[in-house]
Amino acid sequence: MISPVLILFSSFLCHVAIAGRTCPKPDDLPFSTVVPLKTFYEPGEEITYSCKPGYVSRGGMRKFICPLTGLWPINTLKCTPRVCPFAGILENGAVRYTTFEYPNTISFSCNTGFYLNGADSAKCTEEGKWSPELPVCAPIICPPPSIPTFATLRVYKPSAGNNSLYRDTAVFECLPQHAMFGNDTITCTTHGNWTKLPECREVKCPFPSRPDNGFVNYPAKPTLYYKDKATFGCHDGYSLDGPEEIECTKLGNWSAMPSCKASCKVPVKKATVVYQGERVKIQEKFKNGMLHGDKVSFFCKNKEKKCSYTEDAQCIDGTIEVPKCFKEHSSLAFWKTDASDVKPC
């Protein structure tokens, strides 16, 4: 028979053993907290898991009681990041991102010609919302351009009310007697301003000089200005070396200064020559002389090869040198063939 004392002692030991099985500190779960958090728990004590701000639970238990065994049950709770709504398509711009989960950030940029009206980035918050609010890409606008002194707007078509959009242009022209320095066309830039304005300046030119053996005509007024014109001519026996008409330039000088050059008397009585790609009789074509600058090609014979070739001669201010190889054909030597009728080399 078992002693009552032994039974009482055994019961005491059993109670002490069971009562001493405390639960350890619970396992850490990603993105979660435990309340209360202690190093050990007595049997019967309760703990509660909760997800940290910005995270939500996806299955699993949240509350546990320390059992008499001192072993916590397996916890299957999962805390996952909140997901912010799709940021959408940024019209006239782009959105750069990796995910829409907390606490990620997305960034924004606009196409050329547009600017960000709002922040250049937004963060997915603990509440699953974007902060700050998503921006928009607004068009870059330039105000009406300033008009330079002594200038007028020749072309200007604002495309945004009275304002202009990126890459719009405006074209200026100067008032009469004024020259433009700089580009006549300005452009609306990405900074919302215009490219550099041109400058209009009054420009005067001196009266052109009369050429020797010639004359000059220009407007009968006290002063000649930018774009004014003068015309030149030569007396008989002279030809103009340069343009017939010149113009006052923006630099305050004339575009050219022609002169009168003497004509040349043809030094041969009879010959077939090439003038401007055609065969002509020099005694007929230039019976009144050759003008300064005129060029002809004389025919010469190569006696060894029995063929012909040409050499050039040009009238320069009253003088022309006939090629030494040229031999003027005599009508008396009818049996000889003129060089112009010999086959070319």
Curated annotation (Swiss-Prot):
Main localisation: secreted
Subcellular localization, as worded in the UniProt entry: Secreted
Name of the protein described by the UniProt record: Beta-2-glycoprotein 1
CDD domains in UniProt: CCP
A Pfam family this chain is assigned to: Sushi_2
Expression across tissues: Expressed by the liver and secreted in plasma.
SMART domains for this protein: CCP
GO molecular function: heparin binding; identical protein binding; lipase binding; lipid binding; lipoprotein lipase activator activity; phospholipid binding
Positions glycosylated per UniProt: T33, T149, N162, N183, N193, N253
Gene Ontology process terms (BP): blood coagulation, intrinsic pathway; chylomicron remodeling; negative regulation of angiogenesis; negative regulation of blood coagulation; negative regulation of endothelial cell migration; negative regulation of endothelial cell proliferation; negative regulation of fibrinolysis; negative regulation of myeloid cell apoptotic process
GO cellular component: cell surface; chylomicron; collagen-containing extracellular matrix; extracellular exosome; extracellular region; extracellular space; high-density lipoprotein particle; platelet dense granule lumen
Disulfide topology: C23-C66, C51-C79, C84-C124, C110-C137, C142-C188, C174-C200, C205-C248, C234-C260, C264-C315, C300-C325, C307-C345
UniProt keywords, alphabetically: Disulfide bond, Glycoprotein, Heparin-binding, Repeat, Secreted, Signal, Sushi
Domain Sushi per the UniProt entry, residue ranges: 21-81, 82-139, 140-202, 203-262
Gene3D superfamilies the record matches: Complement Module, domain 1 (2.10.70.10)
Function: Binds to various kinds of negatively charged substances such as heparin, phospholipids, and dextran sulfate. May prevent activation of the intrinsic blood coagulation cascade by binding to phospholipids on the surface of damaged cells.
PTM summary: N- and O-glycosylated. PubMed:6587378 also reports glycosylation on 'Asn-188' for their allele.
Signal peptide (residue range): 1-19
Region (Sushi-like): 263-345
InterPro entries listed in its UniProt record: Sushi/SCR/CCP_sf (IPR035976), Sushi_2 (IPR015104), Sushi_SCR_CCP_dom (IPR000436)
